[in-house]
A protein has these predicted regions:
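Conserved SAM-binding strand-loop segment of SAM-dependent methyltransferases
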Residues: 75-81
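Conserved helicase motor core of SF1/SF2 NTP-dependent helicases
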Residues: 2-74, 85-304, 308-344
Length: 344
């Protein structure tokens, strides 16, 4: 998606028209164009100065921004993922843009502000999934809401209200997970209903559908080990893929090959066709030996995954569908009888 292809709605236009010489917080639901609005602001300041930076949490989201900025002749040196920023000399910038700011805590927000004269923070509290409990291997990581970041800075958050990514039909899955979002009511376009597929050969089913001519595919799973297993399986079937794990990445967002990434790494990204395998309880165990079932215990990250498709959402399971999702007979899914459900 080229940067100049973004046609802003009236809410986005307010942000775009604001002077960049201020510190601001912008909040918006999944699909409301936060990242693309950020890119517009970055493009604006890039015509004035090289002293700007974009901070994100994940390597995959960094790569998205790098690819987009390359289209306007900007180098990758303007974009940092979080650990990269922590290890850097932390240079000072005139403008700093932080995407998915709900992934950071008060101390980190203060650190960004200390190195940017004008700081812009974009985020959605409902997509806060980078908070981790401490373990013997890691000190953990705390986060704070977008609203708390606005209070910390002393500004009133600007709102992006319209969901441009999701169709009304696909939004109803995320809305089932988090009813308080009223996600489908923010959507303005219709499309195919989500497809619920029951199959004992889930990866073969995904390959079959991809071979039908799909060129903008995201395959989203919870564990990094699932990414590598699926990558190896697809490559053994002669299907080139792009992929990202915790410590390795081979991903080009301009490629038409399927992208295999984790739910966490998918945040901020979008694909025309999104496949989420292992939607049954404990089905992840065919790939990894960990004890946490993401379909039961990692619901915020699942919400993020279900809100990535531009057009088609495929939920695939083999046996017992996770109860956090609509039941198999739900009219939300393709092929089931419709009843009044949602805004239109």
């Amino acid at each position: 998606m080229a940067l100049d292809n973004l046609t802003p709605d009236r809410h986005q236009q307010i942000i775009i028209n604001m002077s960049a010489e201020r510190t601001a917080v912008v909040k918006g639901i999944a699909g409301s164009g936060k990242s693309l609005t950020l890119l517009k602001k970055a493009k604006q300041v890039s015509t004035l100065t090289n002293s700007y930076a974009i901070i994100v949490y994940t390597k995959s989201l960094k790569q998205f921004f790098v690819d987009e900025l390359a289209e306007i002749g900007q180098t990758k040196n303007h974009v940092f993922y979080f650990k990269e920023w922590q290890k850097s000399t932390k240079p000072n910038f005139k403008y700093m843009f932080v995407d998915e700011c709900q992934d950071f805590n008060a101390e980190e927000i203060a650190d960004f502000r200390a190195h940017g004269r004008y700081c812009w923070f974009f985020g959605d509290t409902n997509q806060s999934i980078m908070g981790f409990e401490p373990t013997i291997y890691s000190p953990g990581h705390t986060v704070q809401s977008v609203e708390d970041t606005a209070k910390q800075i002393g500004v009133h958050p600007q709102d992006l209200c319209i969901n441009h990514r999701l169709t009304i039909e696909n939004a109803k899955v995320g809305e089932m997970i988090y009813p308080q979002t009223r996600l489908s009511f923010a959507c303005i376009k219709h499309g195919p209903k989500p497809r619920l597929i029951k199959s004992v050969a889930q990866l073969d089913k995904i390959i079959e559908l991809i071979n039908g001519g799909l060129t903008d595919v995201g395959i989203l799973v919870y564990y990094n080990n699932q990414v590598t297993f699926i990558r190896d399986y697809f490559q053994s079937r002669g299907i080139p893929v792009q992929w990202k794990t915790y410590d390795e990445m081979d991903i080009d967002f301009k490629s038409t090959s399927p992208k295999i990434i984790t739910w966490h790494c998918a945040k901020g990204l979008q694909f025309n066709d999104v496949f989420i395998p292992c939607c049954g309880l404990n089905e992840y165990k065919q790939y990894v030996s960990f004890n946490i079932d993401p379909m039961a215990e990692k619901i915020p990250a699942l919400y993020v995954a279900t809100t990535r498709p531009l057009e088609n959402l495929y939920l695939i399971y083999s046996n017992k569908l996770a109860p956090v999702l609509p039941v198999a007979s739900s009219p939300i899914y393709s092929g089931n009888k419709s009843v009044a459900n949602g805004p239109f």
